[in-house]
Amino acid sequence: MSDRTAIIGDVYSAFATGNAERLSTLLGDTDWVEAGGMPYGGRYRGFGEIAANVFGPINTDVQGFNAAPDEIIPAGDDRVLACGTYRGSGAGGEVAAPFAHLWTVRDGRITNFVQYTDTHLFRQALGQ
């Protein structure tokens, strides 16, 4: 496992355990792009905006939310691709939406995140 894939693995571990302090350190000033069709879609900068606009609402809307990747692979000099399935349950039922997350890690720091997912499946689970 490369250093950059280990860093990204650490993000998913911190999210799964609710370790906001670690997430704040890892995501610091990250440029975060949540898919436009998502209820939380948009561009956010830094952990504060990400937590307020994505992490907080998603944990409120989706019981048992889990974004554990099935694989984390290096993709080029400074990119990492994580693929998996979002799981949990919302007002409209269970969610099982595949995702691909493209991360950029430069000099040991996460600089960018872009989300790709089936937003329709996610919205269905929320009853939207």
Can you name each region flagged by the protein language model?
Residues 1-21, 25, 29, 127-128:
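Short, low-complexity N-terminal intrinsically disordered segments enriched in polar/charged residues
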Residues 25-76:
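A solvent-exposed, acidic/Ser-Thr-rich amphipathic alpha-helical stretch
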Residues 67-73, 86-87, 98-104:
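Hydrophobic/aromatic beta-strand elements that line small-molecule binding cavities or substrate pockets
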Residues 76-86:
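A short hydrophobic beta-strand element
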Residues 92-94, 122-127:
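A short, polar/proline- and glycine-enriched secondary-structure boundary/capping micro-motif
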Residues 102-124:
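Short beta-strand edge/turn micro-motifs at domain boundaries
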